[in-house]
């Protein structure tokens, strides 16, 4: 027997639009300018699962049961009829001026609930809630930790070819919620995330002198890593996030330095 390739069929599942009571829908519409926040969060989950390549979210037009099923047991025969093997349901509402999402994951073939969770956060985090839901569903169905509630740090470029402006930027893994972390006054290169917290290290040419900087994304506070007479470059965090390894050039010779950024010690 000659095996030439593997064949993976994405799991068909249904992401039912999260239900929203009318009062909450109107409030979210005023706050976020969204017609239906339940539909929008469900779209985030659906797109994430599809992009993973492991799941095949079914077209909502094929659903036989109405989306407003947050408080009732699904009619599993209806979902099995459209070939769904898993089903996500839930609701969104305002509680104490915050967004609260409750969702359930159902095994259609077994006819039972296999996960139920709830999240409460500020309304502006609605897209992140969609990513967190996806992470939980992904882990429950695959056994692997999800990666959807993550962000990407990168160098954004703009301007003419002869005078490019480079800014340090961050965005969600799906390309939304872009935020610029620097103004573009100095060249920035090689940003690297700390694996354990919201710190970033990167190279910046302040007054044409290459230096390694440390930036706290949440507070916006940045600092130079070390006070060296020469240039520093190529920063990396250690796997535990407690140290920074970087290169240091002096008198045409390059050295490697390891620095504990929490204490400032080498």
Regions flagged by a language model, labelled:
Residues 7-75, 88:
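Short beta-strand->alpha-helix linker/helix-N-cap micro-motif
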Residues 8-13, 52, 74, 82-87, ...:
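Extracytoplasmic
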Residues 256-263:
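Conserved small/polar residues in nucleotide/adenosyl-binding loops
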Residues 109, 172-176, 216-220:
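Short loop/turn segments that connect beta-strands within beta-propeller blades
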Residues 113-116, 176-180, 220-223:
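Predominantly a core beta-strand signature of beta-propeller blades
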Residues 70-136:
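Amphipathic beta-strand/beta-sheet edge segments enriched in Tyr/Trp
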Residues 91, 153-162, 200-207, 226, ...:
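Beta-strand C-termini and the immediately following turn/loop, strongest in propeller blades
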Residues 125-126, 140, 178, 185-203, ...:
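Conserved beta-propeller blade repeats
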């Amino acid at each position: 027997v000659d095996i030439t390739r593997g064949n993976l069929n994405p799991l068909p599942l249904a992401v039912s639009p999260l239900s929203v009571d009318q009062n909450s829908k109107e409030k979210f519409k005023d706050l976020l300018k969204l017609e239906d926040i339940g539909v929008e969060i469900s779209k985030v989950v659906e797109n994430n699962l599809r992009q993973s390549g492991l799941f095949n979210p079914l077209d909502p037009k094929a659903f036989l049961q109405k989306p407003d099923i947050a408080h009732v047991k699904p009619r599993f025969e209806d979902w099995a009829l459209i070939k769904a093997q898993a089903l996500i349901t839930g609701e969104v509402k305002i509680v104490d001026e915050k967004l609260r999402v409750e969702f359930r994951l159902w095994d259609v073939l077994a006819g039972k609930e296999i996960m139920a969770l709830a999240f409460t956060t500020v309304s502006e985090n609605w897209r992140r809630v969609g990513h967190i839901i996806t992470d939980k569903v992904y882990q429950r169905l695959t056994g692997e930790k999800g990666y959807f509630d993550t962000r990407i740090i990168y160098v954004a470029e703009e301007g003419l070819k002869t005078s490019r402006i480079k800014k340090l930027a961050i965005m969600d893994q799906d390309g939304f919620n872009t935020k610029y972390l620097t103004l573009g006054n100095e060249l920035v290169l090689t940003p690297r995330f700390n694996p354990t917290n919201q710190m970033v290290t990167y190279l910046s040419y302040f007054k044409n002198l290459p230096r390694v900087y440390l930036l706290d994304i949440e507070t916006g506070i940045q600092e130079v890593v070390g006070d060296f007479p020469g240039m520093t470059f190529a920063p990396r965090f250690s796997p535990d996030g407690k140290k920074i390894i970087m290169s240091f050039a002096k008198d045409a010779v390059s050295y490697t330095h390891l620095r504990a950024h929490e204490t400032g010690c080498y």
